[in-house]
């Protein structure tokens, strides 16, 4: 929904457990007018891709085999997001794309007692976004793939897993292609503990301890 409000063509999505590894500016995130997009194996979350393809009434077998985009941190195009909203909008008067998605999760709605509706439940905004871009043939117009020889930067690296053996200095090294890493909230680690480990590598961090 934020795509209806932002003025820039691209916007960055973040979660609270994402850590920025180096100073950033637009030139590191947007290359020749196209935003970085990073692949991951669809096998990590196969239901996302199947459910999203069903919602968009398309085959999930598009693009590089077995690959889809990562989730946060992610760069998204306002134009592509708006086109996704149009694709999701029902033809029925008085309903919009929000209704179309949220109604799938209402157990009291008799329509959801049909197996076909149940099989659409596991969507995410990222799988919908990527598949819609592929359906419309617009992905390459707005995105460049991260982690290639031409564009070595990575939006996300996984050096922080497992946390106990994390080489923090290596993650923050200027030569590391990673722009962000994640210390997942599901680890249940106290934020203060994580902060104490990363603070020495973040300029001015001593003045900004976490709550």
Language model region names:
Residues 1-5:
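Active-site-proximal specificity loops/subdomain of glycosyltransferases
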Residues 21-116:
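Conserved catalytic core of nucleotide-sugar-dependent glycosyltransferases
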Residues 7, 57, 137-138:
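Residue-level recognition of short, structured coil/turn motifs
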Residues 19-23, 28-29, 126, 189-191:
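Short catalytic/ligand-binding loop motif for oxyanion handling, primarily in non-cytosolic enzymes
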Residues 92, 96-211:
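A glycosyltransferase accessory/donor-loop signature
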Residues 8-21:
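Short beta-strand-to-loop acidic/aromatic patch adjacent to the donor-nucleotide binding site
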């Amino acid at each position: 929904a934020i795509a209806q409000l932002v003025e820039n063509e691209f916007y960055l999505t973040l979660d609270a457990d994402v850590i920025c590894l180096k100073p950033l500016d637009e030139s590191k995130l947007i290359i020749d007018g196209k935003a970085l997009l990073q692949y991951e194996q669809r096998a990590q979350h196969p239901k996302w891709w199947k459910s999203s393809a069903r919602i968009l009434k398309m085959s999930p077998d598009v693009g590089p085999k077995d690959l889809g985009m990562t989730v946060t941190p992610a760069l998204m195009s306002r134009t592509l997001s708006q086109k996704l909203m149009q694709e999701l909008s029902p033809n029925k008067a008085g309903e919009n794309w929000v209704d179309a998605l949220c109604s799938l999760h209402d157990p009291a709605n008799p329509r959801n007692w049909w197996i076909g509706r149940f099989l659409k439940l596991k969507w995410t905004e990222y799988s919908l976004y990527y598949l819609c871009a592929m359906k419309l043939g617009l992905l390459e117009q707005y995105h460049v793939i991260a982690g290639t020889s031409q564009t070595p930067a990575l939006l996300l690296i996984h050096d922080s897993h497992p946390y106990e053996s994390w080489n923090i200095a290596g993650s923050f090294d200027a030569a590391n292609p990673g722009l962000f890493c994640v210390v997942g909230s599901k680890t249940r680690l106290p934020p203060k503990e994580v902060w104490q480990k990363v603070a020495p590598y973040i300029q001015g961090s001593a003045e900004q301890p976490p709550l």
